[in-house]
């Protein structure tokens, strides 16, 4: 492998990070919104969310990507590969994040919510000041675990022409006839990305534990 080959795979890593960050930034709050619908048992919407989560969690990322990229034009909606990839990854991770958030909401002490209600605290303020900080702490490990899975799901979008780490390594291996070095380099890059994510989680948890001390 020469410098150009390394750079090609590194550019694939940049694409992986971009797709992951975009879909995570959209999927985490979307998952929270879906979980709140489940928690509040909103009529009709609750059934829709249950069906959505069950369907998407059982659908492979590559199938979802192909469906979005090729089916949406049938309804007059055409997306370039990158927006289509972000949409597919967002839809997928939102379903998994919904269950992470919902688990934290189910285990949230209802007495605290009722106590805030007795003080006539507005609903938005109750959620922002009492519920969200606690479910965020409880959900963080599960959310980060889903983020790592999201990063490892990005090769699925290569089917619509996105050149991420794995696709870039495959191209270099096919061009050089030596597949092992590019895939070892790809493995190192995946490891570094996940390592940074886990270190960020630990920093956040450490800061939260310090802030929570009396």
Stretch-by-stretch model annotation:
Residues 1-214:
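Transmembrane alpha-helices and adjacent helix-loop boundaries
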């Amino acid at each position: 492998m020469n410098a150009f080959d390394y750079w090609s795979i590194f550019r694939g890593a940049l694409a992986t990070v971009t797709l992951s960050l975009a879909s995570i930034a959209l999927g985490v709050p979307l998952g929270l919104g879906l979980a709140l619908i489940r928690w509040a048992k909103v009529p009709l919407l609750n059934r829709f969310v249950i069906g959505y989560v069950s369907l998407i969690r059982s659908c492979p990322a590559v199938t979802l990507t192909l469906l979005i990229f090729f089916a949406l034009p049938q309804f007059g909606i055409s997306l370039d590969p990158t927006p289509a990839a972000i949409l597919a990854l967002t839809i997928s991770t939102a379903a998994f994040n919904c269950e992470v958030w919902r688990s934290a909401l189910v285990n949230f002490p209802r007495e605290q919510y009722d106590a805030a209600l007795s003080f006539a605290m507005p609903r938005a303020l109750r959620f922002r000041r009492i519920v969200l900080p606690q479910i965020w702490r409880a959900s963080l490990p599960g959310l980060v675990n889903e983020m790592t899975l999201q990063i490892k799901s990005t090769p699925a979008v290569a089917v619509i022409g996105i050149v991420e780490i794995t696709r870039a390594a495959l191209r270099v291996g096919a061009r050089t006839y030596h597949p092992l070095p590019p895939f070892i380099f790809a493995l190192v890059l995946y490891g570094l990305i996940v390592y940074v994510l886990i270190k960020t989680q630990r920093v956040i948890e450490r800061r939260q534990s310090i802030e929570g001390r009396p």
